[in-house]
Amino acid sequence: FVDRNRIPRSNNGPKIPIISNP
């Protein structure tokens, strides 16, 4: 899935979590 608080790369790929909302 794709979080608006994360930079989508791949479903099984690396993701960069951006903590903005709980």
Swiss-Prot record:
Positions of the UniProt region annotated as Disordered: 1-22
Keyword Secreted: yes
Top-level division of the source organism's lineage: Eukaryota
Upregulation: By bacterial infection.
Keywords tagged on the record: Antibiotic, Antimicrobial, Immunity, Innate immunity, Secreted
Subcellular location: Secreted
Gene Ontology BP, a term: defense response to bacterium
One GO CC term, this protein: extracellular region
Function of the molecule: Antibacterial peptide active against Gram-positive bacterium M.luteus and Gram-negative bacterium E.coli.
Protein name per UniProt: Proline-rich peptide
Organism: Calliphora vicina (Blue blowfly)
